[in-house]
Amino acid sequence: MTDKDLIDKNRTETTQTINMEDRKIRVAITHGDTNGIGYELIFKAFSEPEMLELCTPIIYGSPKIAAYHRKAMDLQANFSIINNATDAQDGRVNMLTCIDGEVKVELGTPTKESGDAALKALDKAMTDFRSQHFDVLVTCPAYAQTMNAENYSYKGLKSYAETSIGEGAKGVKMMINESVRIALATDGLAIKDIAANITIDNILDKVRKLHNSMKRDFRISNPRIAVLALNPNVNGTEEKEVLIPAINETNIY
């Protein structure tokens, strides 16, 4: 690579960084179960003017269903209908149509129809995610038992996202507030199965993913990560045989 190539490469990377910092974060929001509280949460959240100053929302849902909820709740909520995520405009609540045809709304009662609508919105959002049309995905509440499609059994958002992204992608379930981020080493397991899943490879994977997320997503240049012991008073063997060796092997401190 010549000096000119290096200069051009650096200039391009700098321009991309500036563009990312200049534009607002694009937040995709799926409407969840159409008989639930998804649209109420969306409309009330974006009734605050400062929300549109923070981000550009793209609602994956249905204008007809949104209008039904708006009328039922007697809310003053405006949205702009778009055909593609790339058409989203800053300063507006952008509504991307994911549902063809009519969907019966029965407020407060999850149905197969409302579950299908939730899954269709998720499917469309994940397709756009793979095309990098938005920066972050927020999902409104849905009822997992009604979100099963033909040849597919919905087992929660984390599992769904991993399957949708493919390529062996594995996520980390996290709980976050303003001061702390907690990542789970295991989730969805019976108590009797937890210890067997506390392995060096698993701990290494979770710690490294958490470390990368702290730097990339939260702009923490030198994250400090605490790994919690498994046993009360460290009275087992997992700490000595698994946790401490995994920490020593991370090479991130």
List the model feature ranges, each with a label.
Residues 3, 17-253:
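Anion-binding alpha/beta catalytic cores of soluble intermediary-metabolism enzymes, centered on
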Residues 3-15:
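Asp/Glu-rich intrinsically disordered low-complexity tracts
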